[in-house]
Amino acid sequence: MGSLKEIKVRIASIRSTQKITAAMKMVSSAKFHHAQTQTEHTLTYANKLSAILNGLLSAECDLDSPYTEQRKVSKVAIAVFASSTGLCGTFNANIWKELSATIQTYKNQQIEVRLYPIGKKIADELHKAGYSFDTDFITIGEKPSYESAVSLANRLMELFVTGKA
């Protein structure tokens, strides 16, 4: 057993570590809450956009667009969003689990999958698992902008129109 002084130093060290851990937990919690709030605002927008698109598609007029034509699904593109840091609890792990299951489902149906990871953690997981993926958009989630979203959307729309996804 150590001396009384060694024990006091060890206790002080543990308390210091606990304070640092608590501060890190508060910071990550605040960041997560901020991201969750932004996601909720986006969900409202997405629901309205979906309603508008459903209204357009159910209208009786002919909509001549390459995005509305029916075709056999042989290729898909998946843009998967995750964090670039690890202070998110199980967030990245849950996304990886869902992505793996989705990829496997498509592979079982002999459907080719193209991957577009947004976030360093999900890109690292894809790399470890041996998947090939587009690296152009990995960091756009760190500082989201309209321009980067348009760039990703244009790439995905181009792939769809050309039949590559």
Where in the sequence are the language-model features?
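Conserved loop-to-helix interface motifs that mediate assembly, gating, or partner/ligand docking
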Residues: 2-165
